[in-house]
């Protein structure tokens, strides 16, 4: 092959190639708290670790055409609760640390996108703000739009996982505005993980 096409195997460096990094802040894990199974956020990438990673990429000159998407940074982690307000995860750090990370990204010229779910919600109960009977969108048959988790391996409904709900459009728009306002307060952009996903 190389005899017929001598330039085929030549290595080229494309400095303009985009690099997109997704960081996961916290995941949810059910643990026993005082004998009661409770969903607890487990830190994967804290705000300070994200800032250190950004600093290292910048010092190694790898931050050109780079963007960062930070998922699981608030409201319980990756399986986020309804986005009626933004509550940072204390296991990830303080508000000042998140602001410092966002500020360092802006100084380095690296777009930072704070990720959130706005069109879907998990049945979280009265205290978290989502009640399926009241807040879930409905099919034409008046059934709640309850959606099962799908396996990325065999593309079928995964009965071992909890279901989630499509929320009413008014609630989805409120969630969008909440996420946009929160991201703007840190000087970051937004990433809508679920808009357009079905």
Feature names for model-found ranges:
Residues 3-5, 61, 186:
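Residues at helix C-cap/C′ positions in short coil/turn segments immediately following an alpha-helix
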């Amino acid at each position: 092959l190389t005899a017929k096409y001598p330039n085929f195997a030549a290595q080229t460096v494309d400095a303009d190639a985009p690099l997109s990094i997704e960081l996961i802040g916290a995941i949810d894990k059910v643990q026993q708290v005082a004998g009661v199974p409770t969903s607890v956020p487990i830190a994967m990438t804290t705000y300070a670790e994200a800032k250190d990673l950004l600093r290292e990429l910048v010092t190694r000159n790898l931050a050109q055409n780079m963007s960062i998407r930070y998922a699981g940074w608030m409201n319980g982690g990756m399986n986020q609760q309804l986005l009626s307000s933004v509550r940072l995860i204390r296991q990830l750090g303080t508000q000042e640390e998140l602001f410092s990370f966002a500020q360092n990204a802006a100084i380095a010229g690296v777009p930072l996108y704070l990720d959130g779910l706005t069109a879907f919600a998990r049945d979280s109960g009265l205290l978290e703000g989502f009640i399926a009977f009241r807040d879930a969108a409905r099919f034409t048959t008046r059934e709640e739009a309850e959606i099962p988790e799908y396996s990325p391996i065999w593309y079928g409904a995964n009965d071992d996982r909890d279901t989630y709900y499509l929320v009413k459009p008014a609630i989805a728009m409120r969630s969008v505005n909440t996420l946009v306002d929160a991201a703007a307060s840190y000087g970051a952009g937004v990433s809508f993980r679920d808009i357009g996903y079905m």
